[in-house]
From Swiss-Prot:
Residue stretches of each Sequence repeat: 165-179, 180-195, 196-211, 212-226, 227-240, 242-255, 256-271, 272-288
Keyword set, alphabetical order: Cytoplasm, Cytoskeleton, Phosphoprotein, Repeat
GO CC terms in record: actin filament; myofibril; sarcomere
Expressing tissues: Detected in aorta, urinary bladder and uterus (at protein level). Detected in smooth muscle cells. Detected in aorta, bladder, colon, intestine, stomach and uterus.
PANTHER family: LEIOMODIN-1 (PTHR10901:SF5), TROPOMODULIN (PTHR10901)
Domain annotation WH2: ranges: 569-588
Protein name, UniProt field: Leiomodin-1
PROSITE patterns according to UniProt: WH2
Predominant subcellular localization, coarse grouping: cytoplasm
Species of provenance: Mus musculus (Mouse)
Family: Belongs to the tropomodulin family.
The protein's role, per its UniProt record: Required for proper contractility of visceral smooth muscle cells. Mediates nucleation of actin filaments.
Positions of the UniProt region annotated as 5 X 4 AA approximate tandem repeats: 503-522
Amino acid sequence: MSKVAKYRRQVSEDPDIDSLLSTLSPEEMEELEKELDVVDPDGSIPVGLRQRNQTDKQPSGSFNREAMLNFCEKESKKLIQREMSVDESKQVGRKTDAKNGEEKDSDASRKAPGPRQDSDLGKEPKKGVLKKSFSRDREEADGRGGEKPKEEKVIRGIDKGRVRAAVDRKESGKDGREERAAAARKEEEKTGSVKNAGLSRDKDKKKEEVKEPSKKEEVKLTAESRNTVGRREDGRLKESSKENKKPEDEGIGSGGRDWRKEDEKVKKEENQPDKEVREESKTKAPEKQAPSCPNKPSDGQARAEEEAAPSIFDEPLEKVKNNDPEMTEVNVNNSDCITNEILVRFTEALEFNTVVKVFALANTRADDHVAFAIAIMLKANKTITSLNLDSNHITGKGILAIFRALLQNNTLTELRFHNQRHICGVKTEMEIAKLLKENTTLLKLGYHFELAGPRMTVTNLLSRNMDKQRQKRLQEQKQAQEASGEKKDRLEVPKVGALAKGSPKPSPQPSPKPAPKNSPKKAGVPAAPPPPPPPLAPPLIMENLKNSLSPATQRKMGDKVLPAQEKNSRDQLLAAIRSSNLKQLKKVEVPKLLQ
């Protein structure tokens, strides 16, 4: 309200404004303060705090935190209930499978022949039956405590061993059946999900299928371990019964046979679901391949491009094979659809071509096979002058093969093989420098050597080749000039008519050998002698030339050793004047100008 007070002081002269301000409500006063803040900012407040906060707004939507938390709790409870229901359904399925297995085993034991004890052992009793049997054994032991303790102990041990073996078989059979049932249900659920789910679920199914065989292997190992334990116990029981009673031995033997038969049945039952799982996996394979078909149009497009590539390069290949005079350059740089086979076909066609001078295949994914084909082509081809192999997959072996082929090639002047996928290395660079010493035609090499030694040697060799090419060019020019001069001399023939008239003027360029037919009247007169040859230049003294090129210090040292040079006319005149006397001089009249 301080700013409003200031504003009131400023406008206190006008009573109408005071009355208006007094009638304003507090909300209107706040709005007025905001407007005054904008109109007349306070200099004492920092610049960043002078403007009102324009980001303070009321929430546009109704946000309730409690409602959101309640919703999250409900969703989490639903998920937990779903998981619990799935587990319960699995447990119920396992129980039903166990009951079915018990019924089957009881039927098999009833059919099996043998004494009563063995038939009872063949059955798989329930938990209540097992408890009753244990209680009966205890009562019998208490009642007959004084009579035949040794025999009772043996019988109890035999019964206990049989009961334990039966319990172990039960547990192993139940576990195997429960796991089989669970695996079968999972497979059924997977088949339903394959039909209904999209392509995104295929990956999860593959992972589950990979896990299933590992689980089955674990189940097999546990079942085998339990069977081995049961067999060991059976062997021990047999030995103890043989020592005590023979009839019991016979019963135990029959029971062991029954147990073996049951073990074989269990193994067969375990093998059957494995076979069924394999058959189902085979049937599922085509079903899984069917939904993955829409993901393969890219492969079809790539194949179509590869098939279309040969059609694109058929025409240039035919032109190269037929030595088309218009086809002087083969440039397939940066072509995406070209393959190594097509590049090899190009090199084979260029082997006997006499027109193409430039072969460029940069960034075409060419490998060592193409490099070896190019090496063979360079040995036979004598017209290609430029070869570009930049940005490819050629290794040191392919590059060395090309340089060895250059020993038999005298036409290639430019070779580029920079920016390969594989580094050439120290050994290949040294070999390149050695091989280039025997080549005298290569002028440009597109490669940056990593080592300083090969780099300097190659630059020196290339400059040597440049000098040799320049010398050859100069020699060719001289030979051409001499040949043209000889042709001009042969073409210049003197005019017959002018000499027949007997003109006294000689020709400006007299021929050294005049023809005898030119002057029939003067046949007896001897021919005029040819003009004297021009004077030869004075011979150069090699020592003087050496002194002129040597530094001044050496020249001073060798001045005394130099021979006397020939004197010119001025020097001779001055020497004669110095050696003459007044008596020898002749009197000469003074010219009039000097008088």
